[in-house]
Amino acid sequence: YCQAYFSYDSKKSGGFTCSHLRFGDNVIRSPYLVTTPDFVACHVFNYMNMYEVLKGIKPNGTFLLNSMFSPEETVERLSSKVKKELAEKNISFYIINATKIAEEIGLGNRTNTILQSAFFKIAEVIPYELAVKAMKKAIDKSYGKKGENIVKMNYAAVDKGGEVIKIEVKKEWAEACTCGCSCQSEQTSDRPEFIRNIVDVINAQEGDSLPVSAFKGMENGTFPAGTSQYEKRGIASHVPAWHSENCIQCNKCSLVCPHAAIRPFVFTQDELAKVGEITTIKAQGKEFDGMQFRVQVSPLDCTGCGNCVDVCPAKTKALTMESLISQTDEAKNWENITKNVSYKSDLVDITKSVKNSQFAQPLFEFSGACAGCGETPYIKLITQLFGERMIVANATGCSSIYGGSCPSMPYTKNAKGRGPAWANSLFEDNAEFGLGMATATRKMRDRIERLMKEGLACTCCSDEQKALFQMWLDNRECPETTQKVYDALVPTLSQCGCDICKELEANKQFIVKKSQWIFGGDGWGYDIGYGGLDHVIASGEDVNILVIDTEVYSNTGGQASKATPVGAIAKFAASGKRIRKKDLGMIATTYGYVYVAQVSIGADPAQYLKVLKEAEAYHGPSLIIAYAPCINHGIKIGMGKTQEEGKRAVECGYWHLWRYNPSLAAEGKNPFSLDSKEPDWSKFQAFIDGEVRYNSLKKAFPEEAAALFSAAEENAKWRYNSYKRMASMDWNK
């Protein structure tokens, strides 16, 4: 008999999962987690520094560690505390380099089968030969339809899993120092109190030990922003290394990074002196005259997807993937640069080009999203453009899980203390939640307007203040001007002392024009939250809505939504979707006063940048629908090429880029612009064949798949031709 319980965090990449397994000759009735295990396995070496991995292990127990290092270096890298426990409890200690084995046999970073085999080799719950036979039988069943090559690779994983190495546990380890002094741990004095006392404890899976008193002052559920920067999980086996001699300074690597772990920095001579000896090159552009340029990677925040390397357009790649071990010094460079070098967004127009946009600080960083996530680059760029004044209502789904799961908060603030204010609502009412935020903000800004009008006649307010009041009243909806008024006016409010200035100071956060955003996936926007979304855009309120379209319910495991196209396999559509994809964007255009756009950052990042600029500037509801390649698609070329997959989707006509701008109609122009080129329809079938969600249907039901795939292509052509007709209309007739 066997029993299994699982505890896990919400990270979608490199997340913590603890499997509690029991085996016995009799029925097991233990409705609680294992607290005193006989066997412990740690599949990620870095977890040894993050969690109490050996907690509760029984004397004479067994410990298996997946280590990328030699036996000698493995021992050297273990903390004294771990070695002391191994010695005191006489633990049998084994290692295996499952990471290297997986790479060698073609499984990439998939180590689970190797480590499962290693478990059966040393745990001896059943004879190892029997376990090997059973595992290979399960492989045939699970992967048989995916081809002989996949089966052979997993067979090899099982065979290689038996190659464990036993490490001698020395008696002198029991005398190791565990005092917690500097010889045992890195200096933590620079970590904020909230991080040390709450975030670190929860991330170490010890959150249940926190008393209620630890949350004093946070009774309303508000948490500080930017906590993800302190995690430094180090989950990637390989990370990008920058080669300055090949770099053309396009900043595309920074644009596509799902986790904001690679960024361009421009150094003044003073800043260069502060950071010491690092490799830089002359910065391009007259704005950066006399300055130096560098692309910096944060290896401990990178998930190792490789999209940055894939999009690098240099003839000889300026980035290559290297082992994490070889890039550990870059972690110090990252910390040094981010502390001493400013972002140069004030020297360029960040909305002018993709390159310029990346000189702005991302205010969404180091989330728990999947490696290679196709969603997060969209959000990250929005925060770079508007993050200082953003308010976000986030629907439940992938974007809320990686966007704000306690205690990890990837939305952060800049050196001025400004950044997005973020909140998560229910699946079904997020649009209304965002509308409520926008309405409340508008009402508060109406109060600011009333106060400033009264201030113009106030005898207490100075002439300088009155000039600022008038400037604000003339430019209430201008972000740049209202920010200038804020910076000049707020320091003077406490000096005046009149009731008007006191009330203005109490509500100063509403002086600057806010950028209200509503985020969610296609399961929310097309399905469950569609009624609310329709209500919000019909209201005419000045809100910006981003629907991240993965064409399935990604967070809950890939169920079909109304965004799922014909022929795609998804849960609840196991034999292929039979109904064509809902055209949410076209539905929204029927109102006539809603800004609508369909984008793919992998296909045309400049178009997406233009859409963001237009949507934010439009005084009314804006809806942006973004194509996001997802792990649920089963992309054959891998999640390291999600940007390439988005590009291919547009090239073959699977996805189309367009904008509907009501402002153009007011000028007598056609509001509809078709931004993508004529598709190469000959590539359509090859594109869908490159994703398991389509390809697996062909293997299971070849004749039915052929009919559905043909219908999918015809639907795409029909949709494209309808867009073409709209784009060619003479709006004056």
Language-model region placement:
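Active-site cofactor/cluster-binding pocket
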Residues: 1-202, 272-277, 566-571, 628-666
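Thiamine diphosphate
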Residues: 1-59, 368, 374-391, 400-413, ...
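A structural-propensity feature for long, helix-poor, extended segments
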Residues: 6-44, 48, 148, 158, ...
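Short acidic, glycine/serine/threonine-rich loops at helix termini
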Residues: 14-17, 52-53, 74-78, 105-108, ...
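Ferredoxin-type iron-sulfur electron-transfer modules and their immediate structural context
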Residues: 131, 135, 144-301, 309-517, ...
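Glycine-rich ThDP/TPP pyrophosphate-binding loop and its adjacent helix/strand module
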Residues: 496-498, 512-520, 527-543, 548-678
